Amino acid sequence: MLLPHLNDFRDRIAARDADWRAGAVVYQVFVDRFAPAENFHAKTSLYPAPKRMRHWHETPAKGHFVESAGVWSHEIDFWGGDLQSVRAKLGHLEAIRADVLYLNPIHLAYTNHKYDSADYLEISPEYGTRADLRMLVGDAHARGLKVVLDGVFNHVGKRHRFFEEAMRDPHSPYRSWFFIGSEYPNGYRGWADVPNLPDLHVERDEVRDHLWRGPESAVRSYLRDGIDGWRLDVASDLGPHFLRELTEAAHEEKQGALVVGEIWNAPAGWDRALDGILNMNLRMTLLDYCSGRVDGHTTSHRLKDMVDDAGIEFILRCWSTLENHDTPRLARLVPDLAARRIAHTLQAALPGAPNLYYGQEVGTDGDADPENRAPMRWDLVRDDHEEWSYMRRLYSTRRSLRALSKGDVLFLSSRRLLAFLRTTDRTLETVLVLANMEDVAVTETLSVRDGRIMAGTDFRDALDYDRPDAMQVNVQMGFTTVTVPPKSVRILKVVPPRPGQHSPYKRMA
């Protein structure tokens, strides 16, 4: 790596420092399942049959199709969480060093997942009201947390009042909001041909006015309520042009707002439409590596291609996801704890905004929907729980290392390891990350390709810095020889010169 033009580098890092979206830790909450409501029994009237209330110790399972409701039974099983119970648990987000609270959909809808909107401008009563949301946002902001909502703007639920009127009255002005006709199997077009999810005709001006263009639109009005951004469901279905229009509307309404899209593709090119995407490309790469399907050398090349193609600024705002409400839990896909620790650590150390799905931090297990939406295991949030204890240390360390949230990335050539640097405008903030997925220790000599790293510089394990046996390596003439234990990962930071000691960095930034 050539010495960067220092002023340009400083300016780029300073811009990232000022942008809360770059490298933020995002904690995702499925509201019904995150924390039990204090008034659980008083809420029974909100769940009329065929909806069912479940107890917190129960786990969701695939159900049967309920003909009268037009949905599956597991879609209308409820555990009773709400916005007030989320407020009561904001301290947990602080403990994991989260920067952002992201809520799965909360607008009025029939199901527990709320991806079938019945009214965008109203909160589902099981969860609360717009006033409850404003109180949650206020409490979150007081703790330094941003709040992002899930926007489902490609389709609605069949119980949406506009859709019901459109189907009932051929002359309804809302008829043009949907794709209605005999050429469709159900008499209308549904997302993925699901009858419960009629597609919106977003080409219509009046539809976009209702969703994001108009002053009282969903996107704008919730931003005025204090939220800080939107995660867009099935964003690719909206198309780049309308995504750009929506993103611009959000930025116009609130400077610095975030619009991140659910895109199951490579991230390259989406920066022209969105602030970031859910980086499922990164997820596949990390799962392949931590499951032993590809080696460190191949993984390094895949990650470098991803960053080079999309650009580091965009990647820093993309959400680094290992699991969410649409995927099996990480503990199911990577059952080995040592391998899972590597996945967690790389999610935290690679460029991007780590997206932690509630319960990931305690190793919650579960297959695909609905198993991946189990109630939060609060009994596992304790100091002697190995995974929780490690995740707290990991994210406390991440917050203390500016390079991991705001820095550039430089992948190092290695035959068997995954190795990379995270760098900022301050050389002594450089971080070296080493991962070994093999069952044996690996020793290699790596070229440390940053010319600012002076001969004699030591790097030491940041998570175990004060332990006498903490891993430490030395750089000489741009090389370092490392031995990484089997199935392990290390985040190493520069050992700074002691006060009064000669420093080769005395005239280096």
Q: What are these regions, as identified by a protein language model?
A:
Residues 137-146, 155, 160-171, 217, ...:
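Active-site-proximal helices and loops of the catalytic beta/alpha 8
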Residues 18, 38-54, 112-126, 153-189, ...:
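Aromatic- and acidic-residue-enriched segments that line the glycan-binding/catalytic groove
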Residues 25-27, 101-103, 147-149, 230, ...:
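Hydrophobic faces of well-ordered beta-strands that scaffold small-molecule active sites
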Residues 161-225, 235-236:
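Active-site-adjacent "subsite" loops/lids of carbohydrate-active enzymes
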Residues 68-84, 116-130, 195-210, 227-237, ...:
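The substrate-binding groove and active-site-proximal loops of carbohydrate-active enzymes
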Residues 20-23, 31, 36-74, 78, ...:
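Loop/helix patches that line or flank the sugar-binding groove of alpha-linked glycan CAZymes
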